[in-house]
């Protein structure tokens, strides 16, 4: 069931997830399409998330945006960043000298090499913000050696998270704390509980499909005049993902864009995505167990010990997962 409408305000709207957005030329969504998108959201009872470019907007757009409840996703280098509900850093260097708000949510989009090299710096952000989401921009390039490095990064973040917990704080770091708190899958769910309206006035499963180098006609799933027309819509639902629906890496993005890119099947996750999610899961388990040595901590939560990182490794015993 759809819950959110993501509206890209400009062709150069920031990425906030795994996909890369290389469009530099600004082309605003038509004002009529913006208003029609808002009417669509009202009719379907959807919450709107506006995704901003790095430039200012005309006053009439600002006024239209405020006609409905919404949240704003804005890049850190935008002149409107103080209005953001979610601030996006597209480079870790953009955090240097940035004035963090302890009550705000931040997304750090980062490649693996920068993450490995800057883990100590990034770890200091955990105590400065209400929530930090770390999003890898090159998941498909991870090797076995990279997985080992990522585990080391997670261990470092896990120690910092424990430190904050023990100081009486409530840190939120997506790759560590989400799995500790979750009791069921909490994925991206593009195509099932959210859909994207692009600047061309058409709908796409998520922004990644709009920004794909492939023909946009391939990925368009409707428009403002005709409504949504998602082919095989059930395939975007968790219930139709045979491996993911029995997995307990509940914090996994289950990114259908990466699935399609890596396995040519939106229901089948890649080895890289699975291993990264299970490394995060296991670190969450370690933090949970460590905290329980000192006090009661999420007593209702039970993250079982496992001996695999990719469910395909135990495919014969899927019923044991």
Q: How should these model regions be labeled?
A:
Residues 131, 140-213:
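A C-terminal junction/extension of Radical SAM enzymes
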Residues 6, 25-31, 198, 214, ...:
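Extracellular/mature segments of secreted proteins
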Residues 6-17, 93, 112, 172, ...:
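Class I S-adenosyl-L-methionine
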Residues 13-16, 76-81, 108-110, 187-191, ...:
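Active-site pocket-lining/capping segments in soluble small-molecule metabolic enzymes
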Residues 1-83:
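Conserved alpha-helical substructure of the radical SAM core
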């Amino acid at each position: 069931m759809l819950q959110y409408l993501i509206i890209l305000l400009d062709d150069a709207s920031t990425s906030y997830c795994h996909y890369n957005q290389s469009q530099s030329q600004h082309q605003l969504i038509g004002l009529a399409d913006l208003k029609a998108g808002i009417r669509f959201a009202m009719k379907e009872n959807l919450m709107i998330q506006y995704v901003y470019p790095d430039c200012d907007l005309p006053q009439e757009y600002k006024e239209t945006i405020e006609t409905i409840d919404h949240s704003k996703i804005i890049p850190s280098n935008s002149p409107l960043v103080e209005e953001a509900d979610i601030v996006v850093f597209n480079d870790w260097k953009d955090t240097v000298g940035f004035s963090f708000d302890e009550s705000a949510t931040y997304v750090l989009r980062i490649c693996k090499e920068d993450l490995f090299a800057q883990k100590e710096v990034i770890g200091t952000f955990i105590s400065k913000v209400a929530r930090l989401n770390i999003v890898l921009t090159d998941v498909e390039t991870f090797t076995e050696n990279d997985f080992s490095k990522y585990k080391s990064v997670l261990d470092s973040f896990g120690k910092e998270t424990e430190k904050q917990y023990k100081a009486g704080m409530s840190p939120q770091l997506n790759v560590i704390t989400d799995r500790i708190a979750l009791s069921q899958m909490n994925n991206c769910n593009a195509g099932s509980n959210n859909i994207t309206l692009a600047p061309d006035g058409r709908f796409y499963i998520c922004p990644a499909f709009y920004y794909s180098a492939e023909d946009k006609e391939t990925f368009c799933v409707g428009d403002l005049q005709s409504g949504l027309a998602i082919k095989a819509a059930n395939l975007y639902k968790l219930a139709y993902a045979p491996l993911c629906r029995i997995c307990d890496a509940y914090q996994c993005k289950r990114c259908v864009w990466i699935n399609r890119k890596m396995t040519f099947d939106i229901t089948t996750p890649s080895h890289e995505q699975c291993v990264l999610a299970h490394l995060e899961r296991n670190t969450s388990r370690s933090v949970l167990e460590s905290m329980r040595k000192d006090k009661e901590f999420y007593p209702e939560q039970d993250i079982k010990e496992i001996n695999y990182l990719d469910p395909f490794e135990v495919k014969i015993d899927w019923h044991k997962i």
